Amino acid sequence: MTKSQNVDPAEIKKFEDMASRWWDLEGEFKPLHQINPLRLNYVLEKTEGLFGKKVLDVGCGGGILAESMAVEGAVVTGLDMGKEPLEVARLHALETGTKLDYIQSTIEDHAEQNPQAYDVVTCMEMLEHVPDPQSVITACSKLVKPGGHVFFSTLNRNFKSYLFAIVGAEKLLKIVPEGTHDHEKFIRPAELIKMIDNTPLQELGITGLHYNPLTDTYRLGTNVDVNYIVHTQNLTQ
């Protein structure tokens, strides 16, 4: 598989078809809007703030996380392969007066052209949508400066995550559109950490993301059975 081929056209089309609804707080991307404050605060805490730092958001989609990091004073670049979501992201940034850049490119190509260019790299809810997650993780490690931070979030692969993320979220509660996820592409924490260990990155912490269907709210916690975030740092000199 070459650098430019680590893309699933069906995955790109899936999110392009929903592009116009990225910023609908009650639409298909409502869960991303709900968890965004948690993700943002986690990144802010672990990096001791983003003001003035160069940040790359990989698989940025319509720009929900990217734009919120720019509001915190970061110099943000959003990266995605979907043309339609990027157009929505640019338009929303224009409407809100938020300054950031968006680029249509694979992470591998961007890493080749921008080695050690960023203080912080975020790769949220993206690894489970590509054919070769190791390639993405390696590229992220090349993009971050020595001492810089990289964050990965994805879904665990087990029976509980199938019940919660596929049966519950997609089929019963209709929180996200049916077919959004493929359970076989979910990644166990041990598998993700093994891929991280193949790079200069070092895993510093892992936290779970929990959904309460009774209150329709999310919180961070120690259980990583379904959604989880891994914090890593490039500790090379």
Swiss-Prot record:
Pfam families: Methyltransf_23 (PF13489). S-adenosyl-L-methionine binds at R39, G59, D80, M124. InterPro entries: SAM-dependent_MTases_sf, UbiG_MeTrfase. Keywords: Methyltransferase, S-adenosyl-L-methionine, Transferase, Ubiquinone biosynthesis. Its EC number is 2.1.1.222, 2.1.1.64. One of its GO terms (biological process) is methylation. It is an enzyme of class 2 (transferase). The keyword Methyltransferase applies. The keyword Transferase applies. Gene3D superfamilies: Vaccinia Virus protein VP39. Pathway: Cofactor biosynthesis; ubiquinone biosynthesis. One of its GO terms (molecular function) is polyprenyldihydroxybenzoate methyltransferase activity. It catalyses: a 3-demethylubiquinol + S-adenosyl-L-methionine = a ubiquinol + S-adenosyl-L-homocysteine + H(+); a 3-(all-trans-polyprenyl)benzene-1,2-diol + S-adenosyl-L-methionine = a 2-methoxy-6-(all-trans-polyprenyl)phenol + S-adenosyl-L-homocysteine + H(+). Belongs to the methyltransferase superfamily. UbiG/COQ3 family. O-methyltransferase that catalyzes the 2 O-methylation steps in the ubiquinone biosynthetic pathway. HAMAP family: UbiG (MF_00472). This is Ubiquinone biosynthesis O-methyltransferase. It comes from Vibrio atlanticus (strain LGP32) (Vibrio splendidus (strain Mel32)). The gene is ubiG.
